Every structure is written in structure tokens, then in C-alpha cells.
């Protein structure tokens, strides 16, 4: 993660493709790959155990641009971090070139006056019915308004909604980079696995929650590169008013990023919200240690544990 190279997200199965060098095609697919980008993945991944046949290559497209085509470098290139404006430029290019990607702007700008974007990726049919799927999750989110029979009908009709949010903590720099590549893969890959995800899941991406802090961290990193041996200016805050405690704001709702996150949650009622952080371990899945809010259904708490076990 971060500016130095690609690192794992808990994937521990070595890819068979590494034995023969760069794979010619993606897994279980006749789809060609982008060889130069794939070579960058292999070169800049810190350990082969982080590579699987899902991520050891990048599928090629003659219509949809890779991150490299827009940014000028593959994701994970050493010494590169991407400003939010360039992240957004890439997602808007995806939206222009594929009907599987839609972009939205959050209601409020940050305290620093910056946009916060939301990206939605799924197949064309799902995106055409996005309003209906939001209606379904809204009804399922309030069981007081429906009975068991209607709930079963809505579940059968609806789609799972998975929301990945990146970099609420600005020094944790990897997720805004990775999410651009993930969006491309979900939009372009034609393997059975990715086709099944597009068909059955609506994927939401908030590339960067703390947009002000992200750009500040990129500034500091670039300063360090340009001024070797000099101390980086010390910061009280990453954002305009807050640092690490920005994800403790759900009660006071003092920050635009928190209000945007809440309004998006209430609009989509996602099945899963996956808030991406970074830590010393290669994989750390937090389900909370309790005591849990007594108003939360114990089934929901148990589902957190199930998700954690599945991820690990």
C-alpha cells in the first residue's frame, strides 16, 4: 500500500501464473491482458503470495482506459500518489467509456471546498434500475413498513449493495489508488467471477472520504521527494479541522464528510459498508469487541463475524 509499491490485502494464495511469467489471458477467460500494466503489477508487488489469478494481470480493453492511460502510471507504481482531482478525472473517463460505471457528487463540499464523489459499478441492466433497487433496500431497511412475505419478494427482486470507502485516515494512502484499479477490473473483466459480481451486486465506491487530508498528504509526500533530508512540515490536522478522529464524528455530524457518508447511507441502505483502513498486519478485520449497541439486532452483530471469518 501507499507510495512505495503494491502490497497485499490479505490474499495468501500464490498464483500459478507466476511460474510461467506474465499470463497471456485472464483466469478462465479468452480476454487479452494489458501486458505492460501486468508487468508492472508483477514487478512492484512486494511478495508473490499477494498475487492470485484475480489480480496478477490486468484485462485489456480497446474502449475503456486503464488508470495508466489517464494518470500516466499504473496503480502501485513506486513513488506515486494520486490527488483527488486526478482520481475523479479517471472515474469520469470510466463513466464516459462504459455504461457499467456511473459517477455522483456528494451533497456537500469539504471544509476545504472540494468535491466528494461516489462511483457506482454494476451491469447495465442494474444501473438502469438503480432507483428501484434503492427503493427495495430502503423498504428492507425499515421492517416496520413491510411484512415477512413482502420482505421475501423484495429480497428476491433486489441486489446486494456493497460499499467500499477509502482513506478516511489520510496517512493510510493505499485505498484511493487501489479503488481506481478495482473499478476498472469490475467494469472490464469478463471472467465468470466478475460477471457474476456485476450481475448480482451493485458496487459503490467512495474513493476518498477525507478529500482535504488526502491532498495534503500527497503534498507532503511530494515535498519529501523533492527535498531529501529536510523535515516534512508538521501537521496538527490533515483536514481543515480534524485528523485521525474524523471517524469518531458519527454522533456530532460536525464534518461534511460525515454528513455526506450518512446521506449516502440513507439513500442506498447498503448491504455491506467496507471502510478501508491500513495497519501493521497484512490483514486485520475489525468487527468490534463489544459491548455492542443494545438496539442492534444480534443477527446483525453475528453477520459482522461471518464477514470477518469469510474475509480471513
Give, region by region, the residue ranges found by the protein language model.
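N-terminal pre-domain segments of enzymes
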Residues: 3-84, 89
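Second-shell loop/turn segments in exported
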Residues: 26-30, 73-81, 165-172, 247-251, ...
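Surface-exposed patches in mature extracellular/periplasmic domains of secreted proteins
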Residues: 52-57, 101-108, 192-197
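A non-catalytic alpha/beta surface segment that caps or lines the substrate-entry region
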Residues: 79-126, 131
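Surface-exposed loop and adjacent secondary-structure segments within mature catalytic domains
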Residues: 108-159, 173-182, 195-255, 260-264, ...
